[in-house]
């Protein structure tokens, strides 16, 4: 399992249209999983005894591996975009996600990377999951600013906008799940989730 992507998350932003507000997590301070406004808590899932908080692009970062350490939270409102800073230490052995969002009907969209470093848009609906190439590769050991722009149906990498050839149907308004470090695809071996 050592060959999974090790992504390091430096800062995560969640823009909400409804309140014209922004949720920010920086992983600094006494409660690193609490948003800067003190209202939203990220749920951290890990098989490790102690999660690894390391030096990030600014402040602290959380080391994830695409399958055994990830975070999520539930949010209300019309989400317009997600953004975060990531760095890959290796490419994953299977497609892994930087971040994504899913509505309560099960429609999801995520920014992912494959075993060759190709950036992908991951889309899920009705229990099936597919990927669309964004026709760009990402480097290892470099900080990447990734934006999932739901309003404009595009992804931005370090300020460069990339449009996907396909995009999932619109997410339904209301409660949504934001996930970082793992996508919404389920892949199990016996009872164990091995989603990369």
Task: Report residues per predicted region.
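Short hydrophobic/aromatic patches on beta-strands that form ligand-binding or substrate-lining surfaces
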Residues: 25-27, 81-93, 99, 146-148, ...
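Glycan-recognition/cleft segments
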Residues: 97-121
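Short surface loop/edge beta-strand patches of beta-sandwich-type extracellular domains
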Residues: 64-82, 132-137
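Bacterial N-terminal signal peptides
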Residues: 7-15
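Flexible glycan-contacting loops in extracellular carbohydrate-active proteins
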Residues: 165-193
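Short tryptophan-centered beta-strand motifs in secreted/extracellular beta-sheet-rich domains
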Residues: 142-151, 155
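Short, aromatic/His-centered strand-loop micro-motif at the edge of beta-sheets
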Residues: 123-145
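Extracytoplasmic low-complexity segments
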Residues: 19-67, 191, 195-196
């Amino acid at each position: 399992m050592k060959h999974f992507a090790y992504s390091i998350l430096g800062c995560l932003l969640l823009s909400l249209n409804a309140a014209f507000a922004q949720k920010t997590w920086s992983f600094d301070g006494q409660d690193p999983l609490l948003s800067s406004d003190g209202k939203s808590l990220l749920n951290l899932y890990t098989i490790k005894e102690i999660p690894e908080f390391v030096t990030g692009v600014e402040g602290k970062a959380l080391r994830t591996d695409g399958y055994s350490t990830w975070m999520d939270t539930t949010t209300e409102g019309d989400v317009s975009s997600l953004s975060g800073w990531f760095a890959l230490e290796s490419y994953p052995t299977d497609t892994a996600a930087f971040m994504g969002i899913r509505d309560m009907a099960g429609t999801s969209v995520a920014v992912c990377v494959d075993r060759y470093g190709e950036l992908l848009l991951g889309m899920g609906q009705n229990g099936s999951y597919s990927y669309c190439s964004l026709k760009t590769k990402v480097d290892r050991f470099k900080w990447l600013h990734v934006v999932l722009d739901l309003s404009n149906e595009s992804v931005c990498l370090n300020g460069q906008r990339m449009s996907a050839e396909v995009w999932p149907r619109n997410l339904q308004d209301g409660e949504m799940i934001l996930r970082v470090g793992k996508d919404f695809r389920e892949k199990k071996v016996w009872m164990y989730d091995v989603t990369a």
